[in-house]
Regions:
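Hydrophobic, aromatic-lined core segments that form the binding pocket/scaffold
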Residues: 186-436
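Polybasic, low-complexity association/targeting segments
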Residues: 12-63
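Internal, well-ordered alpha/beta segment that forms a basic, Gly-enriched binding/recognition surface
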Residues: 94-96, 101-198
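Gly/Pro-rich turn-and-neighbor structural signature
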Residues: 49-50, 54-81, 85
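Local cysteine-cluster metal-coordination motifs and their immediate loop/turn environment
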Residues: 16-32, 74-108, 122-130
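Short, flexible, mixed-charge glycine/proline-rich loop motifs
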Residues: 11-14, 69-74, 94-95, 117
Length: 436
């Protein structure tokens, strides 16, 4: 068996820490996918149905939500195997190796790329979102053990060497070019001498430049020069755009852009385990409720639907007032999140809807816009017109639980919606992250 190298991006290692808090948050928000044979193996450990007083241990998902089986949840959304002491009963009684591999890895994410695994994290985990605990390098030994179980025994080196996401649809590049561009994306978002809004606008402009180049015609010796040229040109255009609009009030989006953005807000704000706890007639009612809430959220006026049960009772228009400029410690949290996602390539390829790099960047930018909108909800709930670190963490944890995992966002005409909204991203960024 070919054992792939684990790669931690240096910028992620410098900024990100993690140590399990035993809060069991992941056991309540993570729809745990089961690999072939894992369900049967767990069933053989014990008569779980009798011990837990349940009929169903696993749930078959529809193709719309990803297919396959996941661990069942109770009516409160807790994993059935989570004890009252917030400890996993499988882990406690049978050891770590007895748990599904997805549980063992959480919150780590391994993205195959060019014969390596790029190591990232899920940010719906409180310890990850707050960057508390140990250096990520401390986990390398544990992750290497899990990688052996993660890879099929008949895997060949060439099969994984060939995994490199496209830059755009039908535009392949080699690993050298992909890494060079990806490192530039990290450099742009990490240029914290500039306001976050400007960096996000720069990232979007650079992405637009990437889409115009036929990378198959660029030889390795010219890649670095081409990237530097695009980086400089896109920064110049970004600064000109920001200067031209410095005194221009950014109005809330309306019409078709607001309708499609409202769909994104809904898809990235709903619970990542939504639907797993409702079956039969309750499941039908639940699905009608989803449609109703989405229809409410595509509007600019009217009551804020309770997509999350703790959302405040307010009008959607209350979220469109001007908020105070974002403090640096708040924007730093969002910056760290973006470096974590982009540095670990957790925004494209096999772990992200098989999206090309540019389509993944559009999705990530819409995710950040949604984080800005969710921060407004958190502040409004507390009667504030300024943002806190907790607001940013709430937005990140909510969005990241869906971004790349909720299949609904990538089904049907998803790419058409994505490409349409891409043209409006500068206005969305200026509107919902303009105070940063």
């Amino acid at each position: 068996m070919y054992l792939m190298q684990l790669v931690f991006h240096h910028d992620i290692q410098a900024k990100q820490k993690y140590q399990c808090l035993q809060c069991a948050k992941g056991c309540q928000t993570f729809a745990v996918p089961l690999r072939e044979g894992e369900g049967e193996r767990i069933e053989k450990l014990r008569d779980w149905r009798k011990q837990l007083s349940v009929k169903q241990l696993f749930v078959k998902q529809s193709k719309l939500t990803g297919g396959g089986e996941v661990l069942a949840k109770d009516r409160h959304g807790r994993c059935l195997f989570l004890g009252k002491d917030n400890l996993c009963e499988i882990h406690r009684d049978f050891g770590l190796q007895a748990k599904p591999l997805a549980c063992q890895l959480y919150p780590f994410v391994l993205s195959p790329l060019g014969g390596t695994f790029r190591v990232g994290l899920r940010y719906d985990c409180p310890a990850t979102a707050r960057s508390s605990g140990r250096s990520l390098g401390d986990y390398q030994g544990e992750l290497k053990v899990m990688v052996k179980a993660f890879l099929p025994k008949d895997i060949s080196k060439s099969e994984y060497n060939d995994i490199v996401p496209n830059i755009k649809v039908n535009e392949e590049v080699d690993l050298f070019t992909f890494d060079a561009i990806n490192d530039t994306l990290v450099d742009i978002i990490g240029s914290d001498a500039m306001p976050l809004k400007v960096r996000l606008l720069w990232l979007h402009k650079f992405m637009c430049c990437l889409e115009k180049i036929k990378w198959g015609n660029v030889v390795d010796e010219e890649v670095g020069g081409m990237i530097d040229l695009l980086k400089g040109a896109s920064l110049k255009e970004t600064i000109a755009f920001a200067d031209d609009n410095v005194d221009t009030a950014v109005t809330p989006p309306s019409g078709k852009p607001r309708k499609l953005l409202g769909q994104i807000f809904f898809l990235l704000s709903q619970s990542s385990i939504d639907g797993l706890t409702a079956t039969g007639l309750a499941g039908i009612k639940h699905r009608f409720g989803i449609v109703r809430k989405m229809r409410q959220l595509v509007k600019l006026y009217g009551p804020l639907p309770k997509v999350q049960p703790d959302w405040p009772d307010c009008d959607l228009q209350a979220l469109e007032v001007d908020f105070a400029p974002m403090d640096k410690d708040v924007s730093d949290v969002i910056t760290r999140y973006l470096i974590g996602r982009i540095g670990a390539t957790g925004y494209c390829g096999v772990n992200f809807y098989h999206y090309a790099m540019c389509d993944g960047l559009k999705t990530i930018l819409l995710g950040v816009v949604t984080i800005g909108w969710l921060m407004r909800i958190a502040a409004t709930k507390d009667g504030r017109q300024h943002f806190t670190v907790d607001d940013a963490i709430y937005g990140i944890m909510t969005v990241d639980g869906n971004l790349g995992y909720a299949k609904q966002i990538a089904t049907g005409p998803a790419l058409m919606r994505l490409n349409y909204l891409s043209d409006h991203l500068p206005n969305f960024i200026s509107r919902y992250l303009g105070s940063c």
